[in-house]
């Protein structure tokens, strides 16, 4: 479905997890935050975690735990700290001279991320944010925000979006759209000197997997991070669907008076080879790494369903690295939810009974799909492409039904 996007904005300001949770906790007086400190490792007595070694302003410190240690360093650094502490693949630890506390092969594996790219159109009507790009306009927006915390400075402008299924046989949406009323890249450059708009679109369940590994045992050294983006063939099919479905949206009758020429990838990027080249050049990270300390019930999983690190005692991980599969939406909200749930587990809070109300699923998810056929090769077949776009431009989505298209009849 499509609708307004949720934002973490409070009183006109971006609201971080630190602002919502950490600063109020510090104000209570029972939390001490040491900024500019660098954690080296967790110290064990046998397999019991009992202390943390860290440096602050060039001095090494050790702080002992009364009950347990909770590691919240994120999907890149949590597995790195575990490995420096002796928890990880035995061969990798031995290669860096680190004594093995627990041989856990999956620490640092299963690295996932969300990728996206954007399609841009010129806009036929003067309704985009293009006039705000001048210095005077930016100054006025900034002044309004400083005085009132309202206006264009109080939003990220991705105010609408959607989630769809890329093809039949997928139960839940696997493609996400973010719409922006401006044609611009993240570096501030624009393909047009005028009004435009764009959609940021990407897959949410990539099958590609990467890893995080040690460069050495020095806590100041950066780790080796390899995402292995687009290494699974299904990722290419799904991103072709992203582009096709975005074009379908921009060819809807409701946008006929607004959608001008396609700026990116461009109207002549149709062949699969050309589309793949565009994907390769333009796809980029949404900065949602997760999965490297995978939670699960299997013995091979890094953490158990209580977020406890397997093979040792007194150590938990609480961050997005726990996710066994990337969520089908952005990670900020799910990560906060995960942390709240783990907080209840750590405190031993008795939770209410689970609400097992059935999730809404399209009744014909096995058969229904958009008219774009992911198995069809569009190389040298622009007639089929035009027929597909034309058909979808003539058919509005109604009652949750998706129109079918048999290319053999066009």
Residue ranges of model-derived segments:
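Conserved redox-cofactor binding core of oxidoreductases
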Residues: 1-49, 55-57, 118-142
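FAD-dependent oxidoreductase catalytic-site/capping-region signature
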Residues: 3-5, 124-127, 141-334, 342-407
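Active-site acidic short loop of glycosyltransferases
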Residues: 28, 65-67, 312
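General small-molecule cofactor/ligand-binding pocket signal
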Residues: 32-34, 101-103, 178
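Glycine-rich loop(s) and the adjacent beta-strand/alpha-helix scaffold that form part
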Residues: 42, 51-142, 151-152, 217, ...
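Short glycine-/acidic-enriched loop or helix-start segments at secondary-structure transitions
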Residues: 44, 80-82, 189, 327
